[in-house]
Amino acid sequence: MADEIKKENAPKKLSIQRRTKTTVSGTSTTGKSKEVQVEVRKKRTVTTDLERKAQEQAKLKAKEEAEKRAAEEKLAEKAKREAEKAKAEQIKIEKAKAEQAKASKKNVDVEKEKRRAEEAELRRKADELARQKAEEKAQKAAEEAKRYADFDDSDNDNGKLDDYSDYHLTSSYALEAENEEERRNENRGRSKNKVVKAKKGGRDDENGNKNERQSDRRNQKDVKGKGKHAKKASALQQAFTKPAQVAKADVVIGETITVAELAAKMAVKATEIIKTMMKMGEMVTINQVIDQDTAQLVAEEMGHKVILRKENELEEMVMEDRDVNAEKVHRAPVVTIMGHVDHGKTSLLDYIRKAKVAAGEAGGITQHIGAYHVETNDGKMITFLDTPGHAAFTSMRARGAKATDIVVLVVAADDGVMPQTIEAIQHAKAANAPLVVAVNKIDKPEANPDRVEQELLQHEVISEKFGGDVQFVPVSAKKGLGIDDLLEAILLQSEVLELTAVKDGMASGVVIESYLDKGRGPVATILVQSGTLNRGDIVLCGFEYGRVRAMRDENGKDIQSAGPSIPVEVLGLSGVPAAGDEATVVRDEKKAREVALYRQGKFREVKLARQQKAKLENMFSNMAEGDVAELNVIVKADVQGSVEAIVQALHELSTAEVKVKVVGSGVGGITETDATLAAASNAIMVGFNVRADATARRVIENENIDLRYYSIIYELLNEIKAAMSGMLQPEFKQEIIGLAEVRDVFRHPKFGAIAGCMVTEGLVKRNNPIRVLRDNVVIFEGELESLRRFKDDVSEVRSGMECGIGVKNYNDVKVGDQIEVFEVVEVKRAI
């Protein structure tokens, strides 16, 4: 329904079709005329009024748009014409300015040319005047000479007049005038901006000059060329000159280098280096590692300059780049307090700390950093290291850091010398630190200080009372008796040692202890040994490095700098350093990082090398400098009698070449302290009816210490003897294994003289050295070149058999000679 309504409302069209018929005449294929009827249908559509109105509106709209577009184009054309007009005016103005500038420049050039001409004229006049003066002077000199010549005799008149008539031509004035004239002519012919043209004339006498002038003209033409093809003057010059000889680069050689690396550095083939080394008597492969000296010889042989470089050159350079010529001043002593458990070490430390730290700081010690310094009544300073036990003390010594100057040995007056007291004495002696003995607990009624002195005599600690150099000070840590006397004794000992250090300069010290704090990161306690450590310094500590972000003293207060013998807590390192590591201030953080990475890379090699350090089989490599080798031993036994017997027997084993040194001995099981001492001293540990505890076993495993258990003393002594025998230099002995008598001599084209022999004794071997005897006198010593039985090459011939022997490099064998075959045998020496 809706569709029908829509169709009714739609504009109606009236279509009229017209049919038209017509006739077209044409020519057929046979040439006759032919008529064809064609029907044309035309269709005309008549639109209604609505459609006509819509078409008119569309036409009006199109007309308006066309007019609008025409107006816009007209405006654009007008704007374009105005822009072109403005541009033309601008070009006209610029052209006028350029012409004005050109005219002014032309005027300036004219003025310059005029001024130049005037100067040239003035110069010419001056030259002319100078020439005239020179000629007048020469003429006067000639006339004067002529006048002098008139007074001479008539015989010499003609000759002298001729001589003086030429004077104006040969005198210095005339020569000067001629030189001036030549210079003037040269200057007159030159022009600043023009090339002098050759004169056109007849044929040249030589073709070479003509060719040169032609090439010059060609070059000038090329230089003066115009356009993009014109050549620059610099293009005529040769850009590269071939060197007369091959340039030899400097070769940087480390401590070791492979043949391939050396070839790359020398820019040659590896085969050339192998050939050179073959000529030098060394057979190598392309990947073989050669040492620095060999590489230097090869490089110099091939004409290169060698620069030797150590692998740790950067580390040495960083360490040596320090302040020098700084003045040394007196420094405070660094003291470690050691002793047996419950003998009063901690009480003594606490009393000194409370009594000598300033009143305002007495209760203000917020944290314990392992070290602190106090001032005495005289205003002098002492630094105390609080190292619980002896492990840290020995570890620092094992790493080569001698932090302690003086050891205070605390012994209880009522208890006497105990096992840990003896250990402390051994550690102090191993570190070469002087002892000061503090006899504690003298306030007790059962105290007996004299007994302590007597017992320490047995351990070579001799008091001043008995003529020794060890100070004994009776103290009471509980009541504070003798504390000032102890401090005075420490200061007296430090004066004897004459302790000095550089105060102003880059600091160096040792790490006392370190740990990782959750909030602050790696924290290290550093004892400054020389120089001044400032906040912001770059510190290198073993494998770690970093800039000092903060420094605190033992009271927890922030400080800006610390001098010698001052312990400080440092923040800012890249990691936690090991106790005993050396701390050094360096200038460059980048170089410090490189050194730290280099040390980390070398750590594994050092660890592997340490595994072989204390093995019995390699004790020969640990020989001390000189002829005498030392075997360090630590002895632990179940009873004192066994210890004394073993130590005495070991001392008796010592010889002129190998000495046994008992580094430590004691009663009881093997402790961590014993293991640390063995690692520090490269010692063998011997346990007689005792065993190591768990912590000691861990240290022994980490440090690869040689630990041996025994229950029979003879087995112990025999193995120590074997170790000492291995450290002795071996002996070599010659043993005669065969003798052959020469029965006849034959000549061989290849081997020369061949001795026909009968083996009379022993065995003749092909590869053994020989001697030729004549009348029981050795006339030649060498080796065999050939050994044959009949026509077969053999390796050995037994007694009673005939053989042919060719002696290498010796042809004077005669009938009746004896050929003696021997071998060199290594005889192991035993103690």
Curated annotation (Swiss-Prot):
Residues 190-200 have a biased composition (Basic residues). Residues 364-368 are annotated as: G2. Residues 1-11, 49-150, 157-166, 201-225 have a biased composition (Basic and acidic residues). It comes from the Bacteria. It is found in: Cytoplasm. Residues 386-389 are annotated as: G3. PROSITE patterns: G_TR_2, IF2. One of its GO terms (molecular function) is guanosine tetraphosphate binding. Residues 440-443 are annotated as: G4. Residues 330-500 form the tr-type G domain. Residues 476-478 are annotated as: G5. Residues 22-31 have a biased composition (Low complexity). Residues 339-346 are annotated as: G1. HAMAP family: IF_2_B (MF_00100_B). One of the essential components for the initiation of protein synthesis. Protects formylmethionyl-tRNA from spontaneous hydrolysis and promotes its binding to the 30S ribosomal subunits. Also involved in the hydrolysis of GTP during the formation of the 70S ribosomal complex. NCBIfam families: IF-2 (TIGR00487), small_GTP (TIGR00231). This is Translation initiation factor IF-2. It comes from Histophilus somni (strain 2336). The gene is infB.
